[in-house]
Design a protein with these regions (language model features):
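Acidic-enriched, low-complexity/disordered segments with a strong bias for Aspartate over Glutamate
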Residues: 5-6, 20, 49, 59, ...
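Short, charged/polar micro-motifs that form catalytic or ligand-binding hotspots
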Residues: 15, 19-27, 75, 132-139, ...
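Generic secondary-structure transition motif, activating predominantly at the C-termini of alpha-helices
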Residues: 8-15, 40, 93, 153, ...
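Charge-rich, low-complexity N-terminal segments
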Residues: 1-63
């Protein structure tokens, strides 16, 4: 085997590992969103606005170039060059277009993966990452992350109080 073949094999192996990490991270992002929706105790997946359009209570996406939320499917979101997945969760704070929907930036990174489970670091709005160890279908692994997201939303809502009422 030539030295070039060695390099080609190594390059192929690294690309395969990157794909494995992407698959794992997107699976866990999907599980986080699913857990979060259930954890919130939403009355339904969607609410109907005054025009009869269905609006999701929780939506996933990214902030576009114009600074606006762009919905996207997790499996279509690009991985960052540092091996992380950055997404934005938009949560409606009521069933009315006049009530704010709050966007929360969330970043996931696989720290390790093995037969026992997967270790993921999740940061909410750039805060210190929350370590999450997930085994199989352990639903409650994301409780601390959900609480952090809720806290972020509460602070965003409280900032909207009129100054005279603070």
């Amino acid at each position: 085997m030539s030295h070039f073949d060695d390099l080609c094999q190594l390059s192929f192996a690294v690309e395969e590992k990157k794909k494995d990490v992407e698959r794992l991270i997107k699976r866990e992002a999907t599980r986080l969103v699913s857990f979060y929706k259930g954890w919130l105790g939403l009355p339904a997946e969607h609410w109907i606005d005054e025009c009869g359009e269905r609006r999701p209570y929780v939506d996933v996406g990214f902030i576009g170039s114009g600074g606006t939320f762009q919905p996207a499917r997790i499996n279509e979101m690009p991985m960052q060059t540092d091996g992380t997945l950055q997404m934005v969760l938009r949560t409606a704070t009521g069933s009315d277009r006049d009530l704010p929907a709050v966007t929360v930036p969330v970043k996931l990174q696989v720290m390790s993966a093995g037969g026992d489970g997967i270790d993921v670091a999740i940061s909410v709005d750039g805060d210190k990452p929350i370590p999450v160890f997930v085994m199989g279908t352990d639903e409650y692994s994301y409780s601390e992350v959900a609480l952090k997201i809720k806290s972020y939303i509460q602070k965003a809502i409280q900032k909207q109080y009129p100054a005279s009422l603070k």
